């Protein structure tokens, strides 16, 4: 959520930043709604003060009867009625909060202006892409290996699901353990095993609700399946005040994730690129406003390390204003090279959300010896999605005979297995 005080004091800049997100100017409407809310709040405070004064006089009166006493009683009763009506009006006046809840985060000054991914800015590349490399797509390879099943799975769960078998299931498990080990041992992240069912308020805190309600799966009794472990991890500090010396806090978690893929009809209908259920290792950092820029580079580099150790070619893109996620003020996308598609595809998003999520969930910190609190900054990064990493390994490590060479760093995690070959039932 955006800071209403900042909007109040920076109307023109607010409208300019909204325009960078391709949203029409809204400062005038917000000023009107904010003024109305502040007027009601001011009246409530005045009546509360008047009630306090009159109640004190009543309490100090020697005689608890008579015209003066009864007149004061009537005044207090009238004030209570006014207060009840004003408080009801304030509670019913949700338009301002509803409007603020629909605004995305304000873009950082370094974010390039642009409408879509064509305007994203290349930051760096890693590894070489070979235009003459073997170029079967991952699902062709997986099906031929008899270790990736879409057909039978569709009978169980429908489309956009997959069943991995044998050594591909083992590769999935190996990647999870490898990624968690790298992030905990080399990058100082603390491992968490969080719930994957959360309440709506947790989704709201993370910026998933109300705007993206249709993109998650909801149960019939008030829970939602997480679209990313970011939801569970950032809420670890909801409604808390953290001592400054404990920051940064860095969490890593592997969880299954669930997305309805609303609006993705016709996109990536084959294979493992876009599934309703997928596994992902997620990174979350909680830090101070002064350190969040450096922490953004840190968390991005942690994600990149996984691909570097797997020797997979990738590039890092700085997203433009029109391509950034709702809660982010600045985002790097890491895109992996897929020979089967002959293009780079997103494998990770690494975002600095500033105090956007913290304001929603009241996550604060304070200096030692001080009573003053400040909103933390939250950051998140994919570290990485297991399925898309497997896709990249299958396509970049494929051999002429259809077998898959295991990357060196995964051999021990695979129990010494160096190559995945076709499974014969």
UniProtKB/Swiss-Prot annotation:
Reaction equations catalysed: tRNA(Ser) + L-serine + ATP = L-seryl-tRNA(Ser) + AMP + diphosphate + H(+); tRNA(Sec) + L-serine + ATP = L-seryl-tRNA(Sec) + AMP + diphosphate + H(+)
Pathway info: Aminoacyl-tRNA biosynthesis; selenocysteinyl-tRNA(Sec) biosynthesis; L-seryl-tRNA(Sec) from L-serine and tRNA(Sec): step 1/1
Alphabetically ordered keywords of this record: Aminoacyl-tRNA synthetase, ATP-binding, Cytoplasm, Ligase, Nucleotide-binding, Protein biosynthesis
Signal sequence residues: none
GO MF entries: ATP binding; serine-tRNA ligase activity
UniProt-listed Pfam families: Seryl_tRNA_N, tRNA-synt_2b
InterPro entries: aa-tRNA-synt_IIb, aa-tRNA-synth_II, aa-tRNA-synth_II/BPL/LPL, Ser-tRNA-ligase_type_1, Ser-tRNA-synth_1_N, SerRS_1_N_sf, SerRS_core, tRNA-bd_arm
UniProt free text on domains: Consists of two distinct domains, a catalytic core and a N-terminal extension that is involved in tRNA binding.
UniProt-listed PANTHER family: SERINE--TRNA LIGASE, SERYL-TRNA SYNTHETASE
NCBIfam families: serS
Protein name listed in UniProt: Serine--tRNA ligase
Gene: serS
């Amino acid at each position: 959520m955006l800071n209403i005080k900042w909007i109040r004091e920076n109307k023109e800049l607010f409208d300019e930043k909204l325009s960078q997100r391709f949203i029409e100017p809204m400062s005038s409407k917000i000023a009107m709604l904010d003024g109305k809310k502040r007027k009601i709040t001011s009246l409530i405070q005045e009546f509360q003060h008047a009630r306090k004064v009159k109640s004190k006089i009543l309490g100090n009166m020697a005689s608890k009867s008579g015209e003066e006493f009864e007149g004061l009683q009537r005044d207090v009763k009238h004030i209570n009625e006014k207060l009840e009506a004003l408080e009801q009006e304030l509670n019913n006046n949700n338009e301002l909060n509803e409007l603020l809840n629909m605004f995305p985060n304000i873009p950082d000054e370094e974010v390039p202006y642009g409408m879509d991914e064509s305007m994203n800015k290349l930051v760096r590349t890693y590894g070489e892409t070979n235009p003459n490399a073997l170029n079967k797509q991952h699902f062709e390879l997986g099906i031929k290996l008899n270790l990736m099943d879409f057909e039978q799975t569709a009978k169980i769960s429908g489309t956009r699901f997959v069943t991995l078998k044998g050594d591909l299931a083992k590769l999935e498990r190996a990647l999870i353990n490898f990624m968690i080990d790298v992030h905990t041992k080399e990058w100082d992240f603390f491992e968490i095993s969080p719930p994957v069912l959360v309440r709506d308020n947790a989704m709201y805190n993370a910026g998933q609700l109300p705007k993206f309600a249709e993109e998650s799966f909801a149960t019939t009794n008030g829970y939602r399946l997480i679209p990313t472990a970011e939801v569970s991890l950032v809420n670890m500090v909801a409604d808390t005040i953290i001592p400054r010396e404990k920051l940064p806090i860095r969490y890593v978690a592997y969880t299954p994730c669930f997305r309805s893929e609303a609006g993705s009809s016709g996109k990536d209908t084959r294979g493992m690129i876009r599934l309703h259920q997928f596994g992902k290792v997620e990174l979350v950092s909680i830090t101070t406003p002064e350190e969040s820029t450096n922490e953004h580079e840190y968390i991005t580099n942690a994600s990149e390390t996984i691909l570097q150790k797997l020797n997979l070619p990738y590039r890092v893109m700085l997203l433009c204003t029109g391509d950034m996620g709702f809660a982010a003020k600045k985002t790097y996308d890491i895109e992996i090279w897929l020979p089967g598609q002959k293009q780079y595809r997103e494998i990770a998003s690494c975002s600095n959300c500033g105090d956007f999520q913290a304001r929603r969930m009241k996550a604060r910190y304070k200096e030692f010896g001080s009573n003053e609190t400040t909103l933390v900054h939250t950051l998140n990064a994919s570290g990485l999605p297991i399925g898309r990493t497997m896709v990249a390994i299958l396509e970049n490590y494929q051999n002429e005979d259809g077998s898959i060479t295991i990357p060196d760093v995964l051999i021990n995690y695979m129990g010494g297995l160096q190559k995945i070959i076709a499974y014969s039932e």
